[in-house]
Amino acid sequence: MGAAISQGALIAIVCNGLVGFLLLLLWVILCWACHSRSADVDSLSESSPNSSPGPCPEKAPPPQKPSHEGSYLLQP
């Protein structure tokens, strides 16, 4: 019985493994959710650029401005 592991050590090893596995699973789910959300926003912006930005305002396209608006400042 030289390889006997105490019950407390066995419980600690199992719990640490479960916590690590759950953290890894949570990280994968978050990455998948963010990736699929950004892909949905990209497909929406390609199909209809005038549509509402949707659930991700940080990915919204910038408002369209006339290109000659800033040229007045450059001319003397």
Curated annotation (Swiss-Prot):
Molecular function per GO: hormone activity
GO cellular component: extracellular region; plasma membrane
Keywords, sorted A to Z: Secreted, Signal
Biased composition (Pro residues): 52-65
Region (Disordered): 41-76
GO BP term, pick one: positive regulation of Notch signaling pathway
Organs and tissues of expression: Expressed in liver and brain. Expressed in regions of the brain involved in metabolic regulation.
Subcellular localization(s) per the UniProt record: Secreted
Triggers of expression: In liver, up-regulated in mice fed a high-fat diet for 2 days, and down-regulated in obese mice fed a chronic high fat diet. Also down-regulated in liver 4 hours after treatment with LXR agonist GW3965.
Signal sequence range: 1-33
Function noted in UniProt: Involved in the regulation of glucose homeostasis and lipid metabolism.
UniProt protein name: Adropin
Organism: Mus musculus (Mouse)
